[in-house]
């Protein structure tokens, strides 16, 4: 079970449809950084600029994270501080300041990197500021996060917009009890939550979460938490709805990763399947992993043309066969039983009877609550 494009849009408000975040990547970004931002890269063959230099150019050099402050709160404060600076400029100077701010937001927050420097691979896409809003930045965020989760060797090695995973867990796995609601009805959903600061060690936190996941009935997972939400408060949903519920390739410059929606949708008998995307580029094919480019000048609109065509055609629809939670739980239990649980403390249930009863009980409780 993983976040989907609909989750990204509802939680962050970032577009997940439209033009793919793709183009040409370079071995050096020194020339575009100097020309479009008026700054310098760290090294000649680098795609990083100093965060402090970016903030200083926007007159917000001292805007650092405060203790207990979330990324969302930090960026809101940074935006407010930079607003006055942006309002004072006109013409080319205003465009340069806006590109600096967008580079900071995209390179540090949406497509975050390890350490303090800010990535600027997105800079060529910001040359024409009038088209910046047409890109599917939310889909790029998800591709970047998937790639990070698939390559990280330690719990602390994940990069990307981690608050997405936190809020996603608050809705889909409420039994974890990790978040505190603060602004009921606010949209995007990210604004509704206050992130609790846990003083325990990271190892201890991860261990506790693993223990809970090992023993919780799968009937307590909320597959469709958006049911009951008013879409009227989020008008941007209708625009990108055609991208929901589909197997599709996600693009983030030199990272191209498949979203296997069949592995997360409420479909019957497909959760353990491996969905392979047909491709003519067999030497590249690594199911479940991303395509990451080497340090060469690469035009990704040509190099991954087949995957880009898939995006432009909005992938392939995944239809759910389950008409109710009870149907889903019954079929799931019959098909997998206790095999889907990795925890050693969960009782062996080869015929899926415990899982079946849990699913029926959960469905009955929900029906009672709806009365």
Give the location of each predicted region.
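Structural stabilizers in ordered domains
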Residues: 1-371
């Amino acid at each position: 079970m993983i976040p989907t494009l609909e989750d990204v849009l509802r939680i962050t408000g970032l577009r997940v449809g439209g033009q793919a975040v793709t183009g040409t990547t370079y071995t050096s970004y020194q020339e575009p950084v100097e020309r479009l931002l008026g700054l310098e890269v760290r090294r000649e063959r680098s795609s990083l600029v100093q965060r402090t230099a970016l903030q200083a150019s926007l007159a917000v050099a001292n805007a650092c994270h405060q203790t207990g402050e979330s990324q969302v709160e930090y960026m809101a404060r940074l935006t407010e501080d930079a607003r006055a600076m942006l309002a004072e400029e006109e013409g080319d100077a205003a465009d340069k300041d806006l590109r600096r701010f967008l580079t900071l937001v995209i390179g540090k927050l949406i497509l975050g990197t390890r350490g303090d420097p800010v990535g600027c691979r997105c800079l060529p896409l910001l040359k024409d500021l009038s088209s910046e809003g047409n890109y599917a930045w939310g889909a790029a965020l998800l591709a970047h996060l998937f790639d990070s989760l698939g390559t990280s060797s330690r719990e602390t090695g994940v990069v990307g917009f981690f608050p997405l995973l936190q809020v996603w867990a608050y809705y889909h796995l409420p039994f974890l009890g990790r978040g505190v609601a603060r602004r009921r009805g606010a949209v995007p959903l990210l604004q509704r939550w206050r992130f609790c600061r846990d003083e325990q060690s990271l190892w201890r936190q991860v261990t506790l979460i693993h223990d809970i996941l090992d023993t919780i009935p799968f009937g307590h997972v909320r597959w469709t938490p958006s049911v009951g939400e008013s879409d009227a408060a989020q008008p941007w949903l209708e625009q990108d709805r055609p991208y929901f519920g589909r197997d599709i390739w996600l693009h983030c410059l030199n990272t191209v990763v498949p979203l296997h929606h069949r592995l997360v949708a409420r479909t019957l008998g497909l959760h353990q399947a491996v969905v392979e995307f047909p491709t003519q580029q067999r030497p590249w094919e690594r199911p479940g992993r991303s395509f990451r480019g080497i340090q060469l000048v690469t035009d990704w609109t040509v190099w991954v043309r087949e995957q880009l065509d898939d995006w432009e055609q909005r992938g392939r629809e995944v239809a759910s066969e389950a008409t109710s939670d009870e149907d889903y739980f019954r079929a799931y239990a019959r098909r997998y039983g206790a095999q889907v649980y990795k925890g050693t403390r969960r009782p062996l249930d080869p015929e899926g009877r415990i899982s079946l009863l849990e699913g029926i009980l959960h469905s009955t409780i929900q029906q009672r609550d709806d009365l």
